[in-house]
Regions:
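A cross-family phosphate/adenosyl-ligand binding-site feature
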Residues: 2-109, 147-182, 193-222
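Basic, gly/Ser/Thr/Pro-rich low-complexity segments located predominantly at protein N termini
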Residues: 25-26, 56-57, 123-126, 141
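Proline-rich low-complexity regions
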Residues: 77-80, 117, 141
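Active-site/ligand-binding-proximal alpha/beta "capping" segment
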Residues: 100-136, 143, 194-203
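Hydrophobic "lid"/C-terminal helical patch
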Residues: 188
């Protein structure tokens, strides 16, 4: 897989990528969350690309989507995982060569990101896709679903980065954080409306593409 992210083009949200950790919050809460995702996204005919590592939650998403018109695709980065791992539900399961390839695939094949609580792997994904957005490698909105105020302390940490001049305010504002999927979709549409107005004046470079200024291209390979 090539280490490049597609350049920006005017678009609406057709596919949302869901990221999150592998640990279960609780059976009932996960089932309710899966149905909430599918219910809200189906209203706008938005499909789901699941990039998380919780295969049980993936099964819940697939089950919730069975009676709806929402398509659920799973981007998996462990070739040993089989369909039986998520029960009897069916869905397209993709297997990339590495975690890095997997993340690039998700950026290239989704129009927005919704991030659930998670650990180091989830934080790594958040900061990768946010830093790529900061450098204009993509302009897709990134939303943190702040379940039980999980991301509140992270946002305080980032605000401290702004105070100490390590993070600019526009870069800090890349991350959207709200409590519900419905509110995230509203924020996403507003974000895309602004970016669509900017597209003619600003064309981001693809990752690895040579810039006009005399700097070496950014190498994101691992």
């Amino acid at each position: 897989m090539e280490f490049s992210v597609s350049s920006y083009r005017s678009h609406s949200i057709k596919t949302v990528c869901i990221l999150g950790g592998s640990k279960l919050i609780g059976h009932i809460q996960h089932v309710d969350m899966a149905y909430q995702f599918v219910k809200e996204l189906e209203k706008y005919k938005i499909d789901i690309l699941y990039g998380g590592s919780n295969y049980i939650f993936l099964g819940y998403l697939l089950d919730a989507a069975q009676n709806e018109r929402t398509n659920v695709t799973s981007a998996l980065n462990y070739p040993t995982v089989r369909t039986s791992s998520i029960g009897g539900s069916t869905g397209l399961m993709l297997q990339a060569q590495s975690v890095h390839d997997n993340l690039i695939y998700m950026v290239n094949n989704s129009d927005a990101f919704i991030v659930l609580p998670g650990g180091y792997g989830t934080l790594n994904e958040i900061f990768n896709i946010t830093s790529w957005a900061e450098r204009d490698f993509h302009t897709k909105p990134i939303g943190l679903l702040n379940i039980n105020n999980f991301f509140s302390d992270l946002l305080t940490f980032l605000d401290q980065g702004v105070d100490h001049k390590f993070i600019s305010q526009p870069s800090r504002d890349i991350l959207i954080c709200v409590d519900t999927v419905a509110d995230l979709l509203i924020k996403f549409q507003a974000h895309i409306s602004v970016k669509n107005l900017e597209v003619k004046a600003h064309q981001p470079q693809a990752i690895g593409a040579k810039r006009k200024r005399s700097l070496d291209p950014l190498d994101l390979s691992l």
